[in-house]
Swiss-Prot record:
The gene is rplL. Forms part of the ribosomal stalk which helps the ribosome interact with GTP-bound translation factors. Is thus essential for accurate translation. One of its GO terms (cellular component) is cytosolic large ribosomal subunit. This is Large ribosomal subunit protein bL12. Belongs to the bacterial ribosomal protein bL12 family. The keyword Transport does not apply.
Length: 124
C-alpha cells in the first residue's frame, strides 16, 4: 500500500532538527538536487541599484539559560550532538554560540526549541 502525504507529513513533523538535516542530505544525494533556495531576480530599478546579498548562514546565540537550565541543556545537546558536560559548559558560559553557519530554517527551529525551554536566544 502506498504511503499518503499525510503519513509523510506526520513522520516529518515528529523529527528532530538533526533528523531533518539528515533527511535533507539524503534527498540531495538520492535525487541530485540542492536544498539551497534560488535567488529570484526582481525587476530592476536601473543599473544604479546595487544588488543586495541575502544572508544564507546564521548563528544561534544563547544569551541566557533562563529558569529551566536543565531543559536548555537538553536542547543544546540535541541540536549540537555535544556531551552532557560540554552542553552544560556552553549553557553556563552564556552568551555563547550554540550553532554557527546554519540555514535560517534550522536556526529558527533551534531558537524556538530553546525559547520553549525558557532560554533567551538570538539569531545573527
Amino acid at each position: 500500500m502506498a504511503i499518503s502525504k499525510e503519513d509523510i507529513l506526520e513522520a516529518v513533523g515528529s523529527m528532530t532538527v538533526m533528523e531533518l538535516n539528515d533527511l535533507v542530505k539524503a534527498f540531495e544525494e538520492k535525487f541530485g538536487v540542492s536544498a539551497a533556495s534560488m535567488a529570484v531576480a526582481a525587476p530592476g530599478a536601473g543599473a544604479a541599484a546595487a544588488p543586495v546579498e541575502e544572508k544564507t548562514e546564521f548563528d544561534v546565540i544563547l544569551l541566557a539559560a533562563g529558569e529551566k537550565k536543565v531543559e536548555a541543556i537538553k536542547v543544546v545537546r540535541a541540536a549540537t550532538g555535544l556531551g552532557l558536560k560540554e552542553a552544560k559548559d556552553l549553557v553556563d558560559g552564556a552568551p555563547k554560540a550554540v550553532k554557527e553557519g546554519i540555514s535560517k530554517a534550522d536556526a529558527e527551529a533551534i531558537k524556538k526549541q530553546l525559547e520553549d525551554a525558557g532560554a533567551k536566544v538570538e539569531i545573527k
